[in-house]
Amino acid sequence: VHKESPEVVFLAEAFTRPAMMHALGKAGFHQSYTYFTWRTSKWEITEYGREVAQGTSAFFRPNFWVNTPDINPFHLQSGNPAMFALRAVLASTLTPSWGMYAGYELYEHRAFKEGGEEYMDSEKYEIKVRDWEGAGKKGLTLAPFIAQLNAIRKAHPALQRLRNLTFHDTDSDAIIAYSKREGKDLVLVVVNLDPSYAQGTTVHWNMQALGIDGHDFEVKDLLDGASMTWNPHTFVSLNPARPVGKVAHIVQVKL
């Protein structure tokens, strides 16, 4: 296939044992579904992020999907827009490849039955017609935010790499922080994992890992354009009740 079409990407759509998923990667599949869909806590995301960025990166290329045609994750079934936004931030900034199943941007969340992960009126069994234009006019869509995330990814080489992921300590389990650097492009990400309440914490940046000398450093928030001065122990507060962009900071460090 690659002799005629080298741009083709083979995706292993397999949620199975880690050994089998890794074997598919070694056999030639360029990308794979991952367990990100079920990693929700700070500890789970940190451990899994380290695994795919360092532990298995020589042969396993993860694709972080926020949902799939088969999986309507429990954490999305409340329909809270902030949860959809924060999961999109995580998926789009932790790894170079991410994906979603149509309807995510419209906050589709109804489950077929309580305790299950199957979508109500699943598109696997019927043709679905979605009113994207109408949702856009009513402001009931995450599409502009998703487009913004993809524009940020396109503009920043650091977010197009897998192995440069570094996590940083925070004083709260409700907020996760990590960084990615490629040359002079240094991006820091702070995400509120609580979609319902404002959370604040101190982020303890590993300055050596960031490659920054000195104390204070200037950053620009790529989501809202705000300029801020941060330091090795930065207090941040993120309120999901504000526009969806404020579930997170995605900042570029001015080097």
Predicted regions and their residues:
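Active-site neighborhood of glycoside hydrolase catalytic domains
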Residues: 1-21
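Structural preference for beta-strand elements that scaffold enzyme active sites
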Residues: 7-11, 30-32, 61-64, 98-99
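Active-site beta-loop-alpha junctions enriched in small/polar residues
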Residues: 13-17, 66-68, 105
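Active-site clefts of carbohydrate-active enzymes
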Residues: 57-81
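Short, glycine/acidic-rich beta->alpha junctions
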Residues: 80-84, 170
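Hydrophobic targeting/anchoring helices
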Residues: 85-101, 110-113
